[in-house]
Amino acid sequence: MASTIKKLTSKYSLKSRYSNFGSCLRKVHIDGFRGINNLDLTLDFPVTAVSGLNGAGKSTLGQLAICGYKKPSTSNDYKRLYIVDFFPISVADPKPITDDAKTIYFYETDDYKKAQEVTISRAHSAWSGYKRQPERHCYYVGFTVYIPKIERRDLSVYGRASLEFTEKREIGKDVVKKMARIIGHKYDDVTFQGISHKKKESEIGIASRLGYSYSENNMGFGEGRILYTIDKLETCPEQSLFILEEPETSLHESAQYEFAKYLLDVCNRRHHQIILSTHSSVILNALPPEARKLITRDVNGVEIHHKISACHVRSILSSGHIRDLDICVEDVFAKILLTEAIRAKNKNILKAIAIHAIGDKDAVREAVKVLRKTGKKAIAVRDADVGQDITNHLLSFPGSRPPEVEVFGNITVAASIKEKYGIDISWILERDDVNDHHKIAEHIASEAETEEEVIRTFAIERYLEKITTEFDELIKNIEIYL
């Protein structure tokens, strides 16, 4: 999956984006919809996963995004969606949108420096601006798009006694394998069978496995919805836009993870743009930080936080014990280093703090911002090469380089590792061409034939034994917050 993410990141770079994804959305500016005002949704990755509490506005973002394209001129059976389809005004909801509401769509063009900008705004009771939108097939996979046939009682159910089979649509073997990998069952075959009853026509999915076959009428909701969704993603035109509402519904955790992998794969192959709302920590953790958005709503309005998910915040808020101070760091290495440095200097404060590995510098900054808005006392300790910003409660590790480089670059640490494991750190990093400091411990552990956490802990202990006052200022600043 890492290689797929790397390929997608390269394809989606600003200079290469249009050639791969066409006139996809770069940004959507939302103003005046369901309490969302002056908000920018930036789409920094082909797959964007929006998390947040119920009622925060996740669905609103997707609904407005899918209204960003007009019907392709070559499509006959395709129907586009408009803002009015999602924001009905009635006695029950007289003002879901403001009188001056508008949405500004920013599309990629062949000149990456100049995005196409189209504003959709209210002109009296109607909406103007749709005609200037680019063309694209868009698909909204909400909860009512796929309802099990046994529940909606379509003609495959009420006309079952006199059904006639019409044309059968075959599904490619590779697509069947992808569905099987997600669900966790091996399928012998999956097809869509055309059916007819009293001049009415429809289509029903039929799966074969373990020596017998069954139709959608006997499928569970999760299995049927996956079949429907994958079929759409694989058979629609390339470079389509998909909005998926909580795709994890009725899927077990392994299926959620495999589905997230599949979304990355299909975007890499078919260059779709996908925006999904989700509460699934499995899906969110399977996607890169650039794909994650957290939306929050309070008395001051609605905000979007980048590279962080609701799961990060939820895990802190529901950790099962109350600490006086939450400290956000970038990764596990930073968490262990800070924990052990505090233990060596003032171990008593460990009982008053909780340290959380969040993500990169942007995710850490956003996490602190969100936590402080919830009333939690929170700070960050960022890598030394990023620096500190005391005003925004962002402290920094000592030194001038990332913690991994400071630790493994220490002469005493290098000598200790060579003595115990017979490894020359400089040579290993040169031989393996390690440019990412997050990979240093992994490569050393591989050469030493041991686990990464063993090397990590050993190096940090040797490092802290050698240094003297380097962490004093940082720990003093942490104590100020207690």
Predicted regions and their residues:
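The start of beta-strands in P-loop NTPase/AAA+ ATPase cores
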Residues: H137, S240-L241, L325, A378
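P-loop NTPase switch/coupling surface
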Residues: M1-E151
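Activity-critical C-terminal alpha-helical subdomain
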Residues: K58, D383-E449
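Extended helical coiled-coil dimerization/tether regions that scaffold
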Residues: A2-N20, F143-M219, D231
